[in-house]
Amino acid sequence: MSLEPADWSLVAALGANLRYIEELEARYAADPKSVDPALAALLRGAVLPGPATPAAPKSGGGAGAALESLSVPAGVPELAFAARSLIEAYRCHGHLAVQLDPLGLSAPIGHPDLLPENHGLSSQDLDRPAPGGLWFGARAGEQPTLGDLHTRLQRAYSQHLGVEMAHITDPARRRFLQERLEPLENRFVDDRTAQLRILDRLIEAEVLEQFLHTKYVGAKRFSLEGGKALIPLLDFLVEFAGEAGVEEIVLGMAHRGRLNVLANLLGKSPRQIFAEFDDLDPLSVMGSSDVKYHMGYSTDVRSQSGHKLHLSLAFNPSHLEAVDPVVIGRVRAKQRRHGDVGRQRVLGVLIHGDAAFAGQGLVAETLNLSGLEGYRTGGTLHIIINNQIGFTTNPTDSRSTHYCTDIAKMLEVPIFHVNGAYPEQVVYATQLAMAYRQAFHTDVVIDMVCFRRYGHNESDEPGFTQPLMYQKIERQPSERQLYSSSLVARSVVAESDVAEIIARKNAALEEELRLARNKGERPRVEWMTGVWAGYCGGTDASVPDVDTSVPKERLQEVARSITTLPPHFTPHPKIERLLQQRAAMGRGDVALDWGMGEHLAFGSLLADKVLVRVSGQDSRRGTFSQRHAVLYDRQNGTPYIPLAHLRDDPKQQGVFHIIDSALSEAGVLGFEYGYSLDYPDGLVIWEAQFGDFVNGAQVILDQF
């Protein structure tokens, strides 16, 4: 039957479906056959007029109420609009129906728009065929009912993994996620090899924790028990990153699970970890009073697919989240050093706690840097070990938001919420997150909801403040036990094989402990390696004085370059006079002022091909109008940086970066400190806008 062009007043009443109509129009224009025939008839020659005023909706709410209120033209496919409205509801709100808590103590809040009846769909409608072309989970040759569609939407968006993406305004980015979530319906690829690899990593994590728990009773280690799915998450992240072209990963994390990450991801020798627990010679390393769960480490690994990656875990203090900007600064410096212009080869990974991610201001400062030209790194992967408690503080007392991750919505990035008791979904979330980061060069967040089996540390008694939670935790099987039971039930592995793997890994740790104690293993901290290998280190007194003078001719050459403007550049009249004054200073006619002296100092380094990077609030002009490192054409606003043009060929001088930073002290100083760690052969400067503003970055100064 041929239909007349649609009455688009129907569309005006559908709110969220305006986006759907726009997508339909685009698909129909590209290929009319790609759209359901009934909907294609609506689009044929249709033009959207101005807004229409729908009738008052009946009670009940949701898009279904709007549908009921309309006088729908004969033949308009109401089911298609209702089905699409239900699909959009799951895409927007499905995460609210996910059972995220592995303990089952908190139920999902749900959302009324996830109910078919709130979209005008009756129980009889659910037995009718679902219109085609509405979502990405359709399979060739099948004809599911609307009830089937609802079930599959629940599996895709409301099972053990939920995705927040409604806050992302770019439809291409939402579509990227929908195309990957809907066909698989929230299931990791049914691959026995991958499942056994997940199990093996869980066993490694569990065996190490239990070994330390029995051999070093009461010693603080901030165990990962309750959140051990972090280990397969990171293991597969390395695999996915290698396949995506990443060559180096810089990680930052706090104390929770750090020893497990060091041993089972970075490959730190267990006997070295045991030596740190035994602490036979506390004065064997320079520096004192640091602890084993602050230590950093670097190593080269090869993924199972054969890709070589360099992994670095940054040293960190007990001050939560202080390491975040330091890691991102290191990533940016490595990208510069490796010529990673596309920001695809070096990846930053930050592992947070739920209370700290919501509570620490440095998190927001670091997130805000992610899109800024002077600080962007192509996207950081944020992983929250969400054990639903901050030391002794409940979430209701530590944040004002539903999720601990809500601060990240300001970046319009996807946020994956996953139940840590389901490691296959944890790995699937990691795969999606990595793919999204590489495709769109933005941050991505994984909120892994888990629990903490012991107190904040192993000598703490959590039952004082969370008695009901810890009664439940005492009865809760471990993640390894749950997953191995699941694989046994699916005939993927036999119980005897699991027991054999556990026994073998325990025996290996026993041998490592025997060797550590028989040989008197001492803790080792390696520094002055990599880009620092050519530096001697030590105290200031042990470093010989060197001549830092610069020939007069070199300074005059720099002065001429920085006071010469390109043709057709029109400076502000006051800037023109300033350049004339600086030219006179360069000739020696008048004494240098601070601004000119600084330019000559930077220029002398740049002439020797040394990188110079300066950032701070209003640093390009200078707070007191003293610097003017960036000049702007008065006619068209085009910027010109004299210090970047000392030579006709930019390869014949050092790179000069002068950056107006975000209005942040701690975050920006942390970033620049991190940058300097991987650029010892460059001059990296953070400038406090006023001298006393430096105390806004006090944690960075004190701890790093």
List the predicted regions and their residue ranges.
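Subset of Sec-pathway N-terminal targeting signals
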Residues: 3-46
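Glycine- and acidic
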Residues: 5-10, 23-24, 213-225, 247-251, ...
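Extended, charge-enriched "interface" segments that sit outside catalytic cores
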Residues: 31, 49-229, 246
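Flexible, glycine-rich loop/tail regions that form catalytic "lids" or insertion modules at the edges
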Residues: 78-88, 95-130, 134, 206, ...
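A structural-propensity feature for long, helix-poor, extended segments
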Residues: 116-152, 290, 393-398, 412-415, ...
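Active-site pocket-lining segments that scaffold enzyme catalytic pockets across diverse folds
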Residues: 207, 211-271, 577-583, 592-606, ...
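Glycine-rich ThDP/TPP pyrophosphate-binding loop and its adjacent helix/strand module
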Residues: 229, 233, 247, 314-518, ...
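Cofactor-binding active-site loop characterized by glycine-rich and histidine/acidic residues
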Residues: 247-412, 416, 624-679
